[in-house]
């Protein structure tokens, strides 16, 4: 277990002082000059320079494991746009891959695993996981990116949530109905909890190692939490997200933690019951309503989101109007901080890069 405060991490790596702390201030509910903004999947296939670097690497995982190229693609959107954060270029499925399931990608079909995790025999064959060793290439990338940023903006580390990773590991890839995962949930819930507990321990180790390597914020992507029924969300997803956050807060109390549950807007009352600094929202939840719900809690929780990524297919005028409406909602309660502008999910490969710039600029041009 690593217990290092932020000063220890900064001094160990001799990182440059942070110049733009707008996003961190918003997370702390401190006054800000303008709304901080970044985009999920901001280093991605909508950028021609990303496509060129990925082609040089040969395939996606080779790109992730190449420190110099992973650093390069992380920096690319920051050269184009006035973003307020960088996010580590990697994939949420690095943990299952390191556990020996054999991650690979098929064109047009997304990620797949050579092995699945459906029986106790499968579980017993999982390889031992130690983030610093099993995923050393991720930590190398984190440190390299921090040095390349030179204090420009803070760096997000991230992981998939236990529930989301479990669905991939059990299904063997993406799924529309989560047949095998939900089959375990309703027929062998104790075994599914055993799997989730094991993955949660790995996630804590993984995010802890990213923080020690230089990540200044971490985000937990609960991409498929919204596939669960209400009571099952609390038991099979939130319970484990809460444990991740609590453990990270014990080890690194000064490092903000964001939890993003796609489709989780209905369960803000459940998600409030954690130490998360910020909750990410998709486009289905109005920001004014979300902030009003969170304001009833015992402590302040920031919000991140939540423009529909498809909005970026529209005209520049439409994008600006949509951003203004989103920020009107975000600040409707009168509090002009505690909010990070983002998309409601990752930016898609078909977006015109110019329109992504319109989005970022429109956020910064909004008068607080």
Swiss-Prot record:
Annotated site location: Transition state stabilizer: 91
Main location per the UniProt record: cytoplasm
Record keyword Cytoplasm present: yes
InterPro entries, alphabetized: UROD/MetE-like_sf (IPR038071), Uroporphyrinogen_deCO2ase_HemE (IPR006361), Uroporphyrinogen_deCOase (IPR000257)
Record-level GO BP terms: protoporphyrinogen IX biosynthetic process from glutamate
GO CC annotations on file: cytosol
CDD domains documented for this protein: URO-D
EC number from the UniProt entry: 4.1.1.37
Catalytically driven reaction(s): uroporphyrinogen III + 4 H(+) = coproporphyrinogen III + 4 CO2
GO molecular function, one term: uroporphyrinogen decarboxylase activity
Keyword Kinase: no
Annotated compartments: Cytoplasm
Domain of life: Bacteria
Keywords: Cytoplasm, Decarboxylase, Lyase, Porphyrin biosynthesis
Pathways per UniProt: Porphyrin-containing compound metabolism; protoporphyrin-IX biosynthesis; coproporphyrinogen-III from 5-aminolevulinate: step 4/4
Subunit structure comment from the entry: Homodimer.
Protein name: Uroporphyrinogen decarboxylase
UniProt gene name: hemE
